[in-house]
């Protein structure tokens, strides 16, 4: 489980034959094989690592429903330890899909509304974009808006978005469970 509070960004060193290679952040000192790390919000298991690199194996499904095949720099967050401080919101690392960045107006960033998931986008609700825990500021049939503070713009890859860039999204897990429970009644 993750919180959507990104620890750092990393450069994508390469992607070939389903193996994603990232530059290893200096403070990621105690890595182990099999450890879960959210990469642009997608939960991946460390396959191998060295002093300077971390390696992950990606399935075709992962490449098809995320932006990892096109990413140059990614957000990283290690899994929340059992005794860790919980901030952000519950992020499973199970990306729902990708959507397009439409425009920004100051601190307001607008994204394409994913039609099949629009019921999970509510004013003041949570969403993870590229693994970042965010609050929906407004929503309509075609788009939704989030507001980004300077720290988020500097610490994550959201500050480098260009119109048309695709971002990973994960809807609020609690909202998914709540809606499912209502449908089953």
Question: At which residue positions do the language-model features occur?
Answer:
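Conserved loop->alpha-helix
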Residues: 1-185
């Amino acid at each position: 489980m993750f919180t959507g509070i990104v620890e750092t960004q990393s450069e994508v060193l390469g992607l070939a034959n389903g193996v994603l290679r990232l530059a290893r952040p200096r403070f990621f000192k105690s890595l182990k094989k099999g450890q879960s790390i959210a990469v642009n919000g997608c939960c991946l298991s460390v396959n191998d690592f060295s002093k300077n690199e971390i390696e992950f194996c990606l399935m075709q499904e992962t490449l098809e429903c995320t932006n990892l095949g096109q990413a140059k720099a990614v957000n990283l967050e290690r899994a929340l330890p059992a005794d860790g401080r919980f901030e952000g919101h519950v992020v499973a690392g199970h990306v729902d899909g990708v959507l397009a960045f439409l425009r920004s107006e100051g601190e307001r960033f607008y994204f394409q509304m994913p039609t099949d998931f629009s019921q999970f986008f509510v004013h003041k609700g949570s969403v993870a974009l590229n693994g970042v825990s965010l609050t929906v500021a407004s929503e309509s049939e075609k788009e939704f808006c989030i507001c980004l503070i300077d720290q988020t713009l500097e610490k994550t890859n959201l500050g480098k978005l260009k119109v048309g860039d695709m971002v990973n999204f994960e809807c609020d897990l609690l909202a998914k469970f709540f809606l499912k429970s209502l449908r089953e009644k």
